[in-house]
Amino acid sequence: MSRISVENVKHVAHLARLAITDQEAEKFQKQLDAIVTFAEQLNELDTTNVKPTTHVLTMRNVMREDVPEQGLPVEEVLKNAPDHKENQIRVPAVLE
């Protein structure tokens, strides 16, 4: 029995604002159902002696050292801004 229905696929497509045909919905339903079936096989593995991990590699937080540097002068930054006022860059309103 399928775990993913065509209606599920159409619903998710609608939520994602994607227009899909009935043929595409059926194709995606089969593909998604195969993926879910494969993922469920992982539940059958015995992981009793396996430590929980959050990453497959042993390296964590490999980052370079932070080195503070002098920033650009305000005048230099404002030269590249299309519009500015009182040392601040003006941008078009995003929210009304």
UniProtKB/Swiss-Prot annotation:
<comment type="subunit">
    <text>Heterotrimer of A, B and C subunits.</text>
</comment>
<protein>
    <recommendedName>
        <fullName>Aspartyl/glutamyl-tRNA(Asn/Gln) amidotransferase subunit C</fullName>
        <ecNumber>6.3.5.-</ecNumber>
    </recommendedName>
</protein>
<comment type="similarity">
    <text>Belongs to the GatC family.</text>
</comment>
<dbReference type="InterPro" id="IPR003837">
    <property type="entry name" value="GatC"/>
</dbReference>
<dbReference type="InterPro" id="IPR036113">
    <property type="entry name" value="Asp/Glu-ADT_sf_sub_c"/>
</dbReference>
<dbReference type="GO" id="GO:0050566">
    <property type="term" value="F:asparaginyl-tRNA synthase (glutamine-hydrolyzing) activity"/>
</dbReference>
<dbReference type="GO" id="GO:0006450">
    <property type="term" value="P:regulation of translational fidelity"/>
</dbReference>
<dbReference type="GO" id="GO:0070681">
    <property type="term" value="P:glutaminyl-tRNAGln biosynthesis via transamidation"/>
</dbReference>
<dbReference type="GO" id="GO:0005524">
    <property type="term" value="F:ATP binding"/>
</dbReference>
<dbReference type="Pfam" id="PF02686">
    <property type="entry name" value="GatC"/>
</dbReference>
<keyword id="KW-0648">Protein biosynthesis</keyword>
<dbReference type="GO" id="GO:0006412">
    <property type="term" value="P:translation"/>
</dbReference>
<keyword id="KW-0067">ATP-binding</keyword>
<keyword id="KW-0436">Ligase</keyword>
<comment type="function">
    <text>Allows the formation of correctly charged Asn-tRNA(Asn) or Gln-tRNA(Gln) through the transamidation of misacylated Asp-tRNA(Asn) or Glu-tRNA(Gln) in organisms which lack either or both of asparaginyl-tRNA or glutaminyl-tRNA synthetases. The reaction takes place in the presence of glutamine and ATP through an activated phospho-Asp-tRNA(Asn) or phospho-Glu-tRNA(Gln).</text>
</comment>
<keyword id="KW-0547">Nucleotide-binding</keyword>
<dbReference type="GO" id="GO:0050567">
    <property type="term" value="F:glutaminyl-tRNA synthase (glutamine-hydrolyzing) activity"/>
</dbReference>
